[in-house]
Amino acid sequence: MAPREPGFAGALPIDGYGPGFFRIAGAVHRGGLLIHAEAAMPWTGFDDLAALRALAGQVDLLLCGMGADIAHLPKGLQVELEALGVMAEPMSTASAARHYNVLLSEGRRVGAALLPMPGAVPTA
């Protein structure tokens, strides 16, 4: 049986990532990223609560990329998002990017809040 390419039905997958950047639909985004099926936008981190609250009704699950390693979400954030109907799962940024693409290809209402990966940021 030949492997099947994932289908995204017009949604925005993460094409690639590296130290300090993400590639979405051929465009490079530097720094943090907030993405769901219909939009990708710069994100400054967990202090930007308005952007996370705006996901209510658009996503059921928010994958939180915490950088190179898994870490706890800021205190109270998970409870606040759950009250809005958004389940939040912290994991490393690399894991969050991969899981986002898999769930998106399944047609799930998923988003990702991704802190950039550490390391030297390419200039070109």
From Swiss-Prot:
One Pfam family cited in the UniProt record for this chain: DUF498
Role noted for this protein: Not required for the biogenesis of c-type cytochromes.
Database matches in CDD domains: Mth938-like (cd00248)
Name by which UniProt lists this protein: Uncharacterized protein RCAP_rcc01784
Organism: Rhodobacter capsulatus (strain ATCC BAA-309 / NBRC 16581 / SB1003)
SUPFAM superfamilies: MTH938-like (SSF64076)
PANTHER family referenced in this protein's UniProt entry, alphabetically: NADH DEHYDROGENASE [UBIQUINONE] 1 ALPHA SUBCOMPLEX ASSEMBLY FACTOR 3, NUCLEAR PROTEIN E3-3
InterPro entries hit by this protein: MTH938-like_sf, NDUFAF3/AAMDC
